[in-house]
Amino acid sequence: MSDAGEVTRSNEVSRLNRIVVLLTLALTTGLLADSGDTPLIDAVKRGDHNAVRTQLRGKIDVNAPGVDGTTALHWAVRADDAELVTMLLRAGANPKSANRYGLAPITLAAMNGSAKVIDLLVSAGVDANTSTTEGEPVIMTAARTGAVDAMKALIARGANVNAREKWFGETAVMWAASENHADAIRVLAEAGADLNARSTQLDAPVLEFPRSGGPNSPLPRGGWTALMFAARDGAIDAARALADLGANLNATALPQTDVPLKPEEISAAQAKNIGTSALVYAIINVHYDLASMLLDKGADPNVVDGAGMGALYAAVDMNSLQWVQGRPAPILTDKLDGSDLVKRLLAKGANPNARLTGKPLKRHHDAGSTMNFGEGTTPLIRAARTNDVAVMNTLLEGGADPFLTLPDRTTSLMIAAGQGYGGIRGEGIRIVVPTPESSIEAMTMLLDRGLDVDAFNNAGNTAMHAAVARGDAVVKFLASRGASLNLKNKAGFTPLDVALGKGGGRGGRGGGVVRESTAALLKQLMEQSGTKTGAP
């Protein structure tokens, strides 16, 4: 190294030494704590009461903040140290100061559930209705924590139990319900909280899947009651408390629309209970025990949403969940499963023949799986789609009419044979995957009740057309039950044509795929019966 380099290095070392000396002096003279905070804040963080007293005897700024605006009082409250809080308040600490995140000490006290510290702060002049800069009232913070004593302290000091946060217009009772804090709900109710208040965020944008073109219409985010939050989150204790306290069990969230609703439309929808109920929210989130409890408390199983979907259809749908898009299926942790709930719903008066009036609301986990299901779909038709034989049997015994069809005259038999089936993916709750065996079992159940094996829909397709994609065993079974082998659909194609890949398309009727084995079977069956194949 050159002499110039040595001199430069020596100067750098000398400068660094001077910085170290200055920092040491700052620390020893109390100008700066080793954490970057003031010595007072550092002492409070350590919980060192003697050091705090020493600092307070000096001429210091008790409200001097750290780099993020957090003061010594914030840290004392966070530590739930009432003695330190008292010392700092007596020394002139500002009880209303907020850090750069908009948090005042009283919000931290509510997070801790500290009634004593809340009393100290309110006695020092803090408003019990303080909110964060994000608009979260402190009573809501305490409700989310479930801190009953803290809530009582705030209420005693004038906290508004019906205050709303600014993002979604939710209230304390909604947050308590979502977190399953039943005791907190009781405290709020006793203080006059509106158990049927609704959140005010009402927009429900409709999304589109570019590949399929199928609509994915999320559940409406607004107009929710506390019971709906409890139902969604499986908060059964909170839901039971709300029911016992008189919450409306049949209130519905606002129906889904492509455009924002006008005020008069909102009022009309709420008056008619057109929308998703807490019972349905519980079911589509796989909280079957909670749903059963709501039924016992008097929930109406026949309340339907804007698509005509009620609790029974939802339970049938969830029992054999279809296309799981991009995420695992829900995990069943309840004592009851979907088939159990179907029985309970029927016993409680659910209409087994209730039809959808439109496309069912998409729930992100089944996007596209029921695109061809909409107006006219019954719970039985939905169960037939996945050959959920146990549920089909329960529905039929409960009064389901197997002769009801979709508007295009597609029968439950065609659906059971594979008409329009889109497949199932994912793992989680019990998933019924249609197989040739399950199709045969489902079709046997329907044919034994008198369905026409050769019934055709508006496109001219029969169960045999649909069976081609389900497998040889299904084709052979239908033939054994007398199904015609060479009926042409409106496009002029027979089941054999479909097996040969003609007239293929979406809907489980060939898709352009050549099924050589099935084609050979159909030719054999037609030859045995003396039917002309019409094939080359």
Q: PLM features: what roles do these ranges have?
A:
Residues 20-30:
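Bacterial N-terminal signal peptides
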Residues 42-46, 75-81, 108-114, 141-147, ...:
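Ankyrin repeat A-helix N-terminal signature
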Residues 67-68, 100-101, 133-134, 167-168, ...:
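Ankyrin repeat start-site detector
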Residues 34-75:
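N-terminal segments that cap or nucleate solenoid repeat domains
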Residues 65, 98, 131, 164-165, ...:
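Ankyrin-repeat boundary/linker signal
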Residues 49-56, 81-89, 114-122, 147-155, ...:
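Ankyrin repeat structural motif
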